[in-house]
Regions:
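Post-Walker A helix-loop "phosphate-sensing" segment adjacent to the P-loop in P-loop NTPases
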Residues: 59-66, 271-276
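Conserved pre-motif I regulatory segment
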Residues: 2-41
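Conserved Walker A/P-loop ATP-binding site and its immediately adjacent core
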Residues: 51, 64-101, 105, 125-130, ...
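Inter-lobe coupling linker of SF2 helicases/translocases
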Residues: 106-198, 206-208, 229-262, 269-331
Length: 331
């Protein structure tokens, strides 16, 4: 039975008495405190910012984290800072957008972030990419991805030239990224060197396109192509996981799963990669075979003709899927 979280007992020392949080907000706060990695799947207007602010401050008070980084869309930066300080007037927060990372400002900003005991650093999605991790760590992650592609290539039928060429192309892209990292200078403080041991991402659907290796890309509902933004978050969260296991990442969005089966796989990689790895489900094909049901139906094409289309239609083994994810997302 999935664990139920009840935050009605929370007192929230330091919070302004001008606000009374709703039950769902307290459930979300307690879920993050009790479990760490969490997906706040709360609707737009449900007060996610205050939920995240209170979760940060309570974890700080309890010694569960040292410094959080709250990543928000650019147009929400000022609002997020205002709401954070409205709920916790005494909070020590540092606010930054991409203008803080121009060549003449980035060293100063990172030094300021590292040398003061901030409760939270609030930063925009676009500025987040300037926060680095050690090149050696990202290189190892790319090597691990390359090994997955090599394993898939051994399983491709010899006459399936299309799949082989597609996998080879994706593999070359990873090799190019690896070469670029080999020449990159690590002359800036990394995310752990500035003291961050938890990342909280608002509007996390912007990071949902995390690439993965698969031989199923011809199926409808499977999109293995990813974005640099998603990969960037994945690397940083995996790095923080080595420093603060179980509390590296919290995601928040009103639209957690939108279009494809692969998005659920990406969420699990973000929040529970170790659980997938121990079960041998860290490869998409094994995961999809376990939790996805394939169906073929005739669909009307623009030409007016019907064509059989095979797609991932539904999730199966849902109780097991939820068990791997931990307790279900807070609603």
């Amino acid at each position: 039975v999935p664990r139920a979280f009840d935050g009605s007992h929370l007192k929230l020392p330091g919070a302004s008495g001008a606000f009374v949080l709703y039950e769902h907000q307290k459930r979300g706060i307690w879920r993050i405190i009790a479990s760490g990695a969490t997906y706040l799947a709360h609707a737009v207007g449900a007060g996610k910012t205050m939920t995240m602010a209170a979760a940060i401050m309570e974890q700080r008070r309890l010694g569960l984290i040292a410094k959080a980084m709250l990543v928000v869309p650019g147009h929400c930066l000022a609002q997020a800072a205002r709401e954070f300080l409205a709920l916790y007037p005494g909070a020590r927060i540092l606010v930054a957008d991409e203008t803080n990372f121009t060549k003449d400002k980035r060293h100063r900003f990172l030094s300021r972030a590292a040398t003061a005991p901030w409760d939270a650093i609030i930063i925009t999605h676009s500025a987040f990419r300037f926060i680095g991790v050690p090149s050696a760590f990202e290189q190892q992650m790319i090597q691990d991805e390359l090994e997955l592609y090599e394993q898939l290539l051994t399983k491709v039928e010899s006459d399936d030239l299309v799949s082989r060429k597609r996998l080879e192309r994706l593999k070359e892209g990873l090799k190019e990224r690896l070469e670029a990292l080999a020449t990159r200078k690590d002359d800036l403080l990394t995310i752990s060197e500035i003291g961050v041991d938890q990342i909280i991402v608002d509007e996390a659907q912007e990071f949902r396109r995390l690439s993965f290796a698969t031989n199923m890309s011809t199926l409808k509902g499977v999109d293995p192509n990813g974005s640099q933004r998603a990969w960037d978050l994945y690397v940083k969260s995996r790095f923080i996981e080595t420093k603060n296991p179980g509390r590296a990442l919290v995601l928040a969005s009103g639209t957690p799963i939108t279009n494809t089966l692969g998005e659920m796989f990406s969420v699990q990689r973000y929040l529970g990669y170790a659980a997938l790895l121990v079960r041998g489900l860290h490869e998409f094909d094994a995961w999809a075979s376990t939790f996805g049901d394939v169906s073929t139906e005739l669909e009307l094409q623009p030409s007016g003709r019907y064509k059989p289309v095979t797609r991932f239609a539904t999730f199966v083994n849902v109780p097991e899927l939820i068990a791997i994810s931990g307790p279900s997302p807070t609603w």
